[in-house]
Amino acid sequence: MKKLHLIYSLILLLNLSACREDERVFLSDSVQVTLPVVGTRIKGFYQLNEGNMGMNRASLDYFDYTTGYYTRDIFSERNPDIVKELGDVGNDIQVYGQKVYAVINVSNLIVVFDVRTARRIKEIEVPNCRYLAFYKDKAYVSSYAGPVQIDP
């Protein structure tokens, strides 16, 4: 009986030690990297970070020319009600009008968010999407999955 109890305890201990740790939540942080630029039409730029394949860690940073501050991981800060990162393997990013389109390859998504606030507007599913271009109010998306047709 003691041996059976010892075996059950050992199995329970192994199961508890095999549990995965909670994933870290990386909070955004800002650092001033240059002096503010005065009198420019360009307010700043977004940088899409690819992340590791299979880790769901594509992220978005923002550099503000008017303040000289670079903010890391702005997307998860501005969108706390959704998954903490953009997805798996960020591939391309484009601004069109008042929206930003981020192509997330392995997640099969194009994430659309507001250019001023970085708040997510919607996601568009495109299998194995890679790159994005705009011409005459149309978006063209390359995909390695064969023909793609998106009907809004």
Positions of predicted regions on the chain:
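Structural motif
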Residues: 54-61, 109-112, 148-151
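Conserved beta-strand positions in repeat-built beta-propeller and related beta-rich domains
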Residues: 47-55, 100-106, 141-145
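Bacterial Sec-dependent N-terminal signal peptides
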Residues: 3-6, 13-43
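Signature of short aromatic-glycine-proline-rich micro-motifs recurring in repeat-based ectodomains
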Residues: 30-31, 86-92
